[in-house]
């Protein structure tokens, strides 16, 4: 399918090679440069999410880090691999022989095609819908051809292949991703100790990642790198050789180091440990005191984090902040104390504590115990999922903090809450449920879900879902007045009503050691994908512009070299689109469709790349965007049958369906203006 993208470029260059220069069409060249940059911007805002959407969603990289990496690899890929857009493509969408005597009309058609493709991709990015840039330019090309020469200029067989790709791409990629993730889950994730099997499989994973992506890049035949001169057997031999060499390096050097790192950072740290604590006696700095539940009724312990300087080190009660990861497991009641976080606008406690995170944010703690624990020993605590974006920061760093490491005052802001982390922040900080209800629960009505838990018949679990359902809050039943406390579920509880039992029905989380194993693998696959994307999809934006420029400079021929600066021009436009608007589609790919973990993200990336390589070589119509969406949905359904947002997937599929006609209509309208108004003059 990628070869189809360069149709306009190569065919326009070929049919105008012998034509006299059209210096009076300088205005059209300038207009083409402007529209091509807008088109590159739209490609960056939409298509780049294919590469780093899942990496951002799993939390292995931040959005800023993803933009930096994507900018580097997209630009380098466009310069090194994008030169293939000047090659001759014999099987195109339109019959260019019809334009032998009307080069002006074909140039106008190129401008129209770029305009139609850019407009629809920008609209799709605004709607946060990932679509195929290839299909956009194809639809726009058909649109201007229909206006210029009617149906006789269109090769409808190519359009049939596009329709087939709507179903072949997501289905084939989804099957392959599902098989890979099933194997990973069966042999690694579901083991009591996943580290041994994970370390054994690590060289295989790295070898497959390097081999598949190298073959994909070299098989494109980039002239600048000399890949066009490599025979098929040479490409296979180089790819396999590099894969084996990488596997040996990983087995002898990476695996031992990874094992030590896991033992040091994960296994040496208990899954539940105090994040901050204050000793009851300054002379016993290394002793941990416990607070009996019965004492709570007679005392009002208030926690405070102070600087470790003489006069400020007051003797206060111990306070343990307990974050339980994963599903509910019973623990001694004395280890779990009620927590409450006052709202940012109403922090009026005389004693407040603030824990400063490594990123500069502050978590404001304020504890109010009265009326929270009654004689029956009821308590409130929260469950935090391990695939959340702040998990490693909160567990692996804060639990090592010592008294006096950070200091806060009553004016400190709580940890910033936005659309993605509102409920997550509330859960980890212990915000009372009624505070959340007062703000948001009354907009659409409150919903509460009662889950059946063994040995806990009297407990009600109240789920606080962000749009991506990162976490839930757990609260015991205190009194009749609290029974009406419920939380608005932003992710549609209607699709999940009637569920009961373990949260594993919804999510299949990665253990910390598993996350460490797959983190760099997912980053590596994303970087390879971004590099290949820069080479392939730069032709969507710059292909028609290259042809216009070569025709204007009288250098168009079947063997004309593509100027590198034009490819870099397109790469810059793609990067700008990513930085300005890319987060919208990245959120859809990495968060909104289904929650992503490092293991599932790696399965999605690797299987998608393998699908594109295989399907392209055997002649099946394929689209990178459709493959990635199909993999995300397939793996998400395997991880949890109710975690996929099927309504969003339906909207994405409808966007695929209308991409070709909408971009074609826009292009046809612009072409009509050129043909009947501008060019006749």
UniProtKB/Swiss-Prot annotation:
Membrane topology listed for this record: Multi-pass membrane protein
Protein name stated in the entry: Sodium-dependent phosphate transporter 1
Residues annotated as transmembrane: 25-45, 66-86, 106-126, 162-182, 201-221, 234-254, 514-534, 561-581, 602-622, 652-672
Induction remarks: By growth hormone.
Lineage: Eukaryota, Metazoa, Chordata, Craniata, Vertebrata
Primary localization class, coarse: membrane
Record keywords, A-Z: Cell membrane, Membrane, Phosphate transport, Phosphoprotein, Receptor, Symport, Transmembrane, Transmembrane helix, Transport
Organism in which the protein naturally occurs: Mus musculus (Mouse)
Family: Belongs to the inorganic phosphate transporter (PiT) (TC 2.A.20) family.
